[in-house]
Amino acid sequence: MKLTKTALCTALFATFTFSANAQTYPDLPVGIKGGTGALIGDTVYVGLGSGGDKFYTLDLKDPSAQWKEIATFPGGERNQPVAAAVDGKLYVFGGLQKNEKGELQLVNDAYRYNPSDNTWMKLPTRSPRGLVGSSGASHGDKVYILGGSNLSIFNGFFQDTVAAGEDKAKKDEIAAAYFDQRPEDYFFTTELLSYEPSTNKWRNEGRIPFSGRAGAAFTIQGNDLVVVNGEIKPGLRTAETHQGKFTAKGVQWKNLPDLPAPKGKSQDGLAGALSGYSNGHYLVTGGANFPGSIKQFKEGKLHAHKGLSKAWHNEVYTLNNGKWRIVGELPMNIGYGFSVSYNNKVLLIGGETDGGKALTSVKAISYDGKKLTIE
Protein backbone atom coordinates (compact mmCIF):
# COMPACT_ATOMS: atom_id res chain seq x y z
CA MET A 1 0.00 0.00 0.00
CA LYS A 2 1.31 3.46 -0.87
CA LEU A 3 1.03 6.10 1.81
CA THR A 4 1.52 9.84 1.60
CA LYS A 5 2.41 11.47 4.85
CA THR A 6 4.90 14.14 5.81
CA ALA A 7 5.70 14.95 9.39
CA LEU A 8 8.19 17.33 10.91
CA CYS A 9 9.76 15.49 13.83
CA THR A 10 11.14 18.30 15.94
CA ALA A 11 12.32 15.88 18.59
CA LEU A 12 14.45 14.12 15.99
CA PHE A 13 15.51 17.29 14.14
CA ALA A 14 14.60 15.69 10.81
CA THR A 15 11.82 15.45 8.30
CA PHE A 16 10.68 12.09 7.11
CA THR A 17 8.32 11.35 4.26
CA PHE A 18 6.28 8.35 3.19
CA SER A 19 6.53 8.68 -0.58
CA ALA A 20 3.62 7.86 -2.88
CA ASN A 21 5.40 8.77 -6.10
CA ALA A 22 8.70 6.91 -5.99
CA GLN A 23 9.41 3.48 -7.44
CA THR A 24 7.95 0.60 -5.45
CA TYR A 25 9.22 -2.96 -5.54
CA PRO A 26 7.06 -6.09 -5.69
CA ASP A 27 6.58 -8.22 -2.59
CA LEU A 28 8.52 -11.44 -2.23
CA PRO A 29 6.63 -14.58 -3.32
CA VAL A 30 6.96 -15.88 0.26
CA GLY A 31 7.91 -14.37 3.58
CA ILE A 32 11.66 -14.69 4.13
CA LYS A 33 13.14 -14.20 7.58
CA GLY A 34 16.46 -15.53 8.78
CA GLY A 35 17.55 -15.87 5.16
CA THR A 36 20.35 -14.25 3.22
CA GLY A 37 21.12 -12.50 -0.03
CA ALA A 38 23.49 -10.47 -2.17
CA LEU A 39 23.52 -7.97 -5.02
CA ILE A 40 25.13 -8.82 -8.36
CA GLY A 41 25.07 -5.83 -10.66
CA ASP A 42 21.46 -4.66 -10.75
CA THR A 43 20.03 -8.00 -9.65
CA VAL A 44 19.33 -8.87 -6.03
CA TYR A 45 19.27 -12.48 -4.81
CA VAL A 46 17.35 -13.43 -1.65
CA GLY A 47 16.49 -16.82 -0.19
CA LEU A 48 16.70 -19.59 2.40
CA GLY A 49 15.56 -19.00 6.00
CA SER A 50 11.78 -19.30 6.17
CA GLY A 51 11.87 -19.50 2.36
CA GLY A 52 13.04 -23.12 2.62
CA ASP A 53 15.59 -24.15 0.00
CA LYS A 54 14.48 -21.48 -2.49
CA PHE A 55 16.25 -18.41 -3.86
CA TYR A 56 14.59 -15.57 -5.76
CA THR A 57 15.96 -12.77 -7.94
CA LEU A 58 14.71 -9.32 -8.87
CA ASP A 59 16.08 -7.03 -11.59
CA LEU A 60 16.13 -3.70 -9.75
CA LYS A 61 16.66 -1.57 -12.86
CA ASP A 62 13.42 -2.82 -14.46
CA PRO A 63 10.39 -1.06 -12.89
CA SER A 64 8.07 -3.79 -14.17
CA ALA A 65 10.20 -6.73 -13.01
CA GLN A 66 8.83 -9.44 -10.73
CA TRP A 67 10.62 -11.88 -8.47
CA LYS A 68 11.82 -15.04 -10.24
CA GLU A 69 12.74 -18.34 -8.64
CA ILE A 70 16.17 -19.71 -9.58
CA ALA A 71 17.56 -23.24 -9.26
CA THR A 72 16.83 -24.87 -5.92
CA PHE A 73 19.61 -24.51 -3.37
CA PRO A 74 21.26 -27.97 -3.06
CA GLY A 75 22.30 -27.64 0.58
CA GLY A 76 18.80 -28.02 1.97
CA GLU A 77 16.71 -25.74 4.13
CA ARG A 78 18.67 -23.64 6.62
CA ASN A 79 18.41 -20.51 8.73
CA GLN A 80 20.89 -17.67 9.16
CA PRO A 81 23.40 -18.59 6.43
CA VAL A 82 25.88 -16.03 5.14
CA ALA A 83 26.01 -14.89 1.51
CA ALA A 84 28.03 -12.47 -0.58
CA ALA A 85 28.86 -11.87 -4.23
CA VAL A 86 32.33 -11.96 -5.80
CA ASP A 87 33.13 -11.67 -9.51
CA GLY A 88 29.50 -12.02 -10.58
CA LYS A 89 28.80 -15.17 -8.59
CA LEU A 90 26.84 -15.80 -5.39
CA TYR A 91 28.48 -17.57 -2.44
CA VAL A 92 26.52 -19.10 0.44
CA PHE A 93 28.09 -20.37 3.65
CA GLY A 94 26.93 -22.25 6.73
CA GLY A 95 23.72 -21.73 8.63
CA LEU A 96 21.56 -23.73 10.99
CA GLN A 97 19.64 -26.83 9.90
CA LYS A 98 18.21 -30.05 11.29
CA ASN A 99 20.16 -33.29 10.96
CA GLU A 100 18.69 -36.77 10.52
CA LYS A 101 18.04 -36.97 14.29
CA GLY A 102 16.00 -33.78 14.23
CA GLU A 103 18.73 -31.84 16.04
CA LEU A 104 19.33 -28.24 15.00
CA GLN A 105 23.00 -28.04 14.06
CA LEU A 106 25.42 -25.45 12.76
CA VAL A 107 26.80 -26.43 9.37
CA ASN A 108 29.99 -25.10 7.79
CA ASP A 109 29.64 -26.03 4.12
CA ALA A 110 29.90 -23.64 1.17
CA TYR A 111 28.17 -23.25 -2.21
CA ARG A 112 28.54 -21.15 -5.34
CA TYR A 113 25.78 -20.07 -7.71
CA ASN A 114 26.57 -19.08 -11.30
CA PRO A 115 23.85 -16.84 -12.80
CA SER A 116 25.08 -17.46 -16.35
CA ASP A 117 23.85 -21.06 -16.38
CA ASN A 118 21.58 -21.11 -13.30
CA THR A 119 23.62 -23.79 -11.51
CA TRP A 120 24.83 -24.42 -7.97
CA MET A 121 28.09 -26.10 -6.98
CA LYS A 122 29.13 -27.38 -3.57
CA LEU A 123 32.63 -26.09 -2.92
CA PRO A 124 35.46 -28.31 -1.64
CA THR A 125 35.92 -26.30 1.55
CA ARG A 126 34.49 -25.77 5.02
CA SER A 127 34.43 -22.60 7.08
CA PRO A 128 36.92 -22.70 9.98
CA ARG A 129 34.32 -21.32 12.40
CA GLY A 130 30.61 -21.74 13.01
CA LEU A 131 28.58 -19.47 10.75
CA VAL A 132 25.28 -18.92 12.54
CA GLY A 133 24.76 -15.33 13.57
CA SER A 134 27.69 -14.37 11.33
CA SER A 135 27.54 -11.35 9.04
CA GLY A 136 29.19 -11.20 5.63
CA ALA A 137 30.15 -8.65 2.98
CA SER A 138 32.45 -8.64 -0.03
CA HIS A 139 35.45 -6.41 -0.67
CA GLY A 140 37.59 -6.82 -3.77
CA ASP A 141 38.01 -10.51 -4.50
CA LYS A 142 37.17 -11.75 -1.00
CA VAL A 143 34.18 -12.40 1.23
CA TYR A 144 34.65 -11.07 4.76
CA ILE A 145 32.77 -12.68 7.63
CA LEU A 146 32.39 -11.26 11.11
CA GLY A 147 31.15 -12.94 14.27
CA GLY A 148 29.11 -16.05 14.76
CA SER A 149 28.21 -18.64 17.38
CA ASN A 150 30.61 -21.36 18.50
CA LEU A 151 29.88 -24.55 16.58
CA SER A 152 30.62 -27.02 19.40
CA ILE A 153 28.75 -25.14 22.13
CA PHE A 154 25.74 -24.34 19.95
CA ASN A 155 25.46 -27.86 18.55
CA GLY A 156 25.93 -29.39 21.99
CA PHE A 157 23.01 -27.41 23.38
CA PHE A 158 20.64 -28.70 20.72
CA GLN A 159 21.95 -32.25 20.96
CA ASP A 160 21.38 -32.28 24.72
CA THR A 161 17.90 -30.78 24.28
CA VAL A 162 16.84 -33.45 21.78
CA ALA A 163 18.35 -36.21 23.95
CA ALA A 164 16.22 -35.03 26.88
CA GLY A 165 13.13 -36.07 24.91
CA GLU A 166 9.89 -35.18 26.70
CA ASP A 167 11.56 -34.70 30.09
CA LYS A 168 10.64 -31.06 30.78
CA ALA A 169 12.67 -30.88 33.99
CA LYS A 170 15.76 -32.07 32.15
CA LYS A 171 15.19 -29.61 29.32
CA ASP A 172 14.79 -26.76 31.81
CA GLU A 173 18.02 -27.81 33.50
CA ILE A 174 19.86 -27.83 30.16
CA ALA A 175 18.50 -24.40 29.21
CA ALA A 176 19.36 -22.91 32.61
CA ALA A 177 22.94 -24.15 32.37
CA TYR A 178 23.24 -22.88 28.80
CA PHE A 179 22.01 -19.34 29.47
CA ASP A 180 23.67 -18.91 32.89
CA GLN A 181 27.16 -18.15 31.56
CA ARG A 182 29.33 -15.09 31.00
CA PRO A 183 29.50 -13.72 27.43
CA GLU A 184 33.12 -14.80 26.98
CA ASP A 185 32.23 -18.39 27.87
CA TYR A 186 30.18 -18.82 24.68
CA PHE A 187 33.34 -18.38 22.59
CA PHE A 188 31.70 -16.38 19.80
CA THR A 189 34.07 -15.85 16.87
CA THR A 190 36.49 -13.01 17.55
CA GLU A 191 38.52 -13.16 14.33
CA LEU A 192 37.62 -11.42 11.10
CA LEU A 193 37.55 -14.21 8.54
CA SER A 194 37.91 -14.00 4.78
CA TYR A 195 37.30 -16.45 1.96
CA GLU A 196 38.95 -15.99 -1.44
CA PRO A 197 37.05 -17.86 -4.17
CA SER A 198 39.91 -17.77 -6.69
CA THR A 199 42.16 -19.79 -4.37
CA ASN A 200 39.44 -21.54 -2.35
CA LYS A 201 41.25 -20.45 0.82
CA TRP A 202 40.15 -19.08 4.18
CA ARG A 203 42.24 -16.51 5.99
CA ASN A 204 42.38 -15.12 9.52
CA GLU A 205 42.38 -11.36 8.95
CA GLY A 206 43.11 -10.59 12.60
CA ARG A 207 41.37 -10.53 15.94
CA ILE A 208 38.66 -7.93 16.37
CA PRO A 209 39.33 -5.64 19.38
CA PHE A 210 35.82 -6.10 20.76
CA SER A 211 33.65 -8.96 21.94
CA GLY A 212 32.43 -11.63 19.55
CA ARG A 213 29.03 -10.91 18.02
CA ALA A 214 26.05 -12.74 16.60
CA GLY A 215 23.49 -10.95 14.46
CA ALA A 216 25.48 -7.71 14.14
CA ALA A 217 24.80 -5.27 11.32
CA PHE A 218 27.97 -5.40 9.21
CA THR A 219 28.62 -3.29 6.12
CA ILE A 220 31.62 -2.64 3.90
CA GLN A 221 31.71 0.50 1.75
CA GLY A 222 34.96 1.37 0.00
CA ASN A 223 37.68 0.71 2.56
CA ASP A 224 35.41 1.22 5.57
CA LEU A 225 33.81 -1.50 7.68
CA VAL A 226 31.04 -0.71 10.17
CA VAL A 227 29.78 -3.05 12.89
CA VAL A 228 26.62 -2.20 14.81
CA ASN A 229 25.52 -4.01 17.97
CA GLY A 230 24.71 -7.73 17.88
CA GLU A 231 24.41 -10.37 20.58
CA ILE A 232 27.35 -10.88 22.93
CA LYS A 233 25.67 -13.97 24.40
CA PRO A 234 22.29 -15.62 23.76
CA GLY A 235 19.57 -13.13 24.70
CA LEU A 236 21.90 -10.21 25.47
CA ARG A 237 22.80 -7.54 22.93
CA THR A 238 25.26 -4.67 23.13
CA ALA A 239 24.78 -1.04 22.09
CA GLU A 240 28.44 -0.80 21.01
CA THR A 241 29.40 0.19 17.46
CA HIS A 242 32.76 0.00 15.72
CA GLN A 243 34.48 1.09 12.53
CA GLY A 244 37.33 -0.58 10.68
CA LYS A 245 39.46 0.46 7.73
CA PHE A 246 41.38 -1.66 5.24
CA THR A 247 45.04 -0.60 5.27
CA ALA A 248 48.36 -2.00 4.07
CA LYS A 249 48.82 -3.33 7.61
CA GLY A 250 45.44 -5.05 7.71
CA VAL A 251 42.14 -3.85 9.14
CA GLN A 252 42.56 -1.08 11.70
CA TRP A 253 39.67 -0.71 14.16
CA LYS A 254 38.30 2.07 16.33
CA ASN A 255 35.30 2.34 18.63
CA LEU A 256 32.35 4.54 17.72
CA PRO A 257 29.77 5.91 20.18
CA ASP A 258 27.10 3.54 21.44
CA LEU A 259 23.81 3.52 19.58
CA PRO A 260 21.56 6.05 21.39
CA ALA A 261 18.34 5.12 23.14
CA PRO A 262 15.00 6.19 21.64
CA LYS A 263 13.27 8.83 23.73
CA GLY A 264 11.68 7.30 26.81
CA LYS A 265 13.21 3.87 26.20
CA SER A 266 16.33 1.97 27.16
CA GLN A 267 18.88 0.99 24.53
CA ASP A 268 19.43 -2.74 24.89
CA GLY A 269 21.32 -3.13 21.63
CA LEU A 270 20.00 -4.74 18.48
CA ALA A 271 20.44 -8.06 16.73
CA GLY A 272 19.14 -8.60 13.22
CA ALA A 273 19.20 -4.89 12.34
CA LEU A 274 19.32 -3.85 8.67
CA SER A 275 21.87 -1.39 7.32
CA GLY A 276 23.32 0.30 4.26
CA TYR A 277 24.36 3.58 2.67
CA SER A 278 22.21 6.34 1.17
CA ASN A 279 23.77 9.44 -0.37
CA GLY A 280 26.91 8.82 1.65
CA HIS A 281 25.02 8.43 4.93
CA TYR A 282 25.17 5.17 6.84
CA LEU A 283 21.71 4.03 7.98
CA VAL A 284 20.71 1.36 10.50
CA THR A 285 17.15 0.33 11.27
CA GLY A 286 15.03 -2.36 12.86
CA GLY A 287 16.42 -5.26 14.83
CA ALA A 288 15.21 -6.97 17.97
CA ASN A 289 16.19 -7.23 21.62
CA PHE A 290 14.92 -7.95 25.12
CA PRO A 291 14.22 -4.59 26.80
CA GLY A 292 15.64 -4.66 30.30
CA SER A 293 18.26 -7.32 29.57
CA ILE A 294 21.26 -5.00 29.95
CA LYS A 295 19.89 -3.78 33.28
CA GLN A 296 19.45 -7.35 34.52
CA PHE A 297 22.94 -8.27 33.33
CA LYS A 298 24.46 -5.31 35.17
CA GLU A 299 22.62 -6.50 38.28
CA GLY A 300 24.54 -9.76 38.05
CA LYS A 301 21.97 -11.93 36.27
CA LEU A 302 23.85 -13.98 33.68
CA HIS A 303 20.56 -15.27 32.23
CA ALA A 304 20.01 -11.65 31.27
CA HIS A 305 16.78 -12.02 29.30
CA LYS A 306 15.04 -14.35 31.75
CA GLY A 307 11.43 -13.27 32.24
CA LEU A 308 11.63 -10.62 29.51
CA SER A 309 9.76 -10.39 26.21
CA LYS A 310 11.40 -9.99 22.82
CA ALA A 311 10.71 -6.68 21.08
CA TRP A 312 11.17 -5.62 17.46
CA HIS A 313 12.00 -2.03 16.53
CA ASN A 314 11.50 0.57 13.79
CA GLU A 315 13.84 3.47 14.57
CA VAL A 316 16.15 4.66 11.78
CA TYR A 317 19.62 5.77 12.90
CA THR A 318 22.28 7.59 10.93
CA LEU A 319 25.99 8.04 11.55
CA ASN A 320 27.33 11.50 10.81
CA ASN A 321 30.72 12.91 11.81
CA GLY A 322 31.21 10.05 14.22
CA LYS A 323 27.89 10.57 16.00
CA TRP A 324 24.62 8.63 15.89
CA ARG A 325 21.17 10.13 15.84
CA ILE A 326 17.64 8.97 15.15
CA VAL A 327 16.17 10.49 11.98
CA GLY A 328 12.79 8.75 11.76
CA GLU A 329 10.82 5.56 12.06
CA LEU A 330 9.63 2.83 9.70
CA PRO A 331 5.87 2.23 9.44
CA MET A 332 6.42 -1.23 10.97
CA ASN A 333 8.85 -3.03 13.26
CA ILE A 334 11.32 -5.23 11.41
CA GLY A 335 14.33 -7.46 11.96
CA TYR A 336 16.28 -10.38 10.49
CA GLY A 337 15.67 -9.40 6.87
CA PHE A 338 18.12 -8.71 4.06
CA SER A 339 19.30 -5.19 3.32
CA VAL A 340 21.31 -3.87 0.40
CA SER A 341 22.50 -0.46 -0.78
CA TYR A 342 21.33 0.37 -4.30
CA ASN A 343 20.95 3.62 -6.22
CA ASN A 344 21.41 5.77 -3.07
CA LYS A 345 18.73 3.82 -1.24
CA VAL A 346 18.78 1.05 1.33
CA LEU A 347 16.40 -1.76 0.38
CA LEU A 348 14.83 -3.69 3.26
CA ILE A 349 13.77 -7.07 1.92
CA GLY A 350 11.64 -9.50 3.90
CA GLY A 351 12.48 -10.09 7.55
CA GLU A 352 10.15 -10.53 10.46
CA THR A 353 7.95 -8.29 12.56
CA ASP A 354 6.23 -8.48 15.95
CA GLY A 355 5.89 -12.03 17.18
CA GLY A 356 8.30 -13.33 14.53
CA LYS A 357 5.86 -13.09 11.61
CA ALA A 358 7.72 -13.43 8.31
CA LEU A 359 7.44 -10.45 5.95
CA THR A 360 7.12 -10.38 2.17
CA SER A 361 7.49 -6.61 1.88
CA VAL A 362 10.26 -4.72 0.12
CA LYS A 363 10.82 -1.19 1.44
CA ALA A 364 13.33 1.44 0.38
CA ILE A 365 14.70 4.16 2.62
CA SER A 366 16.87 7.10 1.63
CA TYR A 367 18.40 10.02 3.48
CA ASP A 368 19.96 13.20 2.10
CA GLY A 369 21.24 14.66 5.36
CA LYS A 370 17.98 16.44 6.09
CA LYS A 371 15.06 14.27 5.05
CA LEU A 372 14.39 10.56 5.47
CA THR A 373 12.19 9.13 2.72
CA ILE A 374 10.42 5.79 3.09
CA GLU A 375 9.01 4.09 -0.01
Swiss-Prot record:
Main location: periplasm
Chemical reaction(s) catalysed: N-acetyl-alpha-neuraminate = N-acetyl-beta-neuraminate
UniProt keywords, alphabetically: Carbohydrate metabolism, Isomerase, Kelch repeat, Periplasm, Repeat, Signal
EC number in record: 5.1.3.24
Intracellular or extracellular location(s): Periplasm
Active site per the UniProt annotation: E231 (proton acceptor)
Cellular-component GO terms for this entry: periplasmic space
Classification via InterPro entries: Kelch-typ_b-propeller, NANM, NanM_proteobact
Any one Gene Ontology molecular-function term assigned to this protein's record: racemase and epimerase activity, acting on carbohydrates and derivatives
First and last residues of every Kelch repeat: 43-87, 89-140, 142-176, 177-222, 225-273, 295-344, 346-375
Major enzyme class: isomerase
Extent of the signal sequence: 1-22
Pfam family, one: NANM
NCBIfam families membership: muta_rot_YjhT, PRK14131.1
PANTHER family for the chain: LD33804P
Function: Converts alpha-N-acetylneuranimic acid (Neu5Ac) to the beta-anomer, accelerating the equilibrium between the alpha- and beta-anomers. Probably facilitates sialidase-negative bacteria to compete successfully for limited amounts of extracellular Neu5Ac, which is likely taken up in the beta-anomer. In addition, the rapid removal of sialic acid from solution might be advantageous to the bacterium to damp down host responses.
Subunit and partners: Homodimer.
Family (UniProt): Belongs to the NanM family.
Annotated HAMAP family: NanM
Name of this chain's protein: N-acetylneuraminate epimerase
Organism: Haemophilus influenzae (strain PittGG)
Gene responsible for this protein: nanM
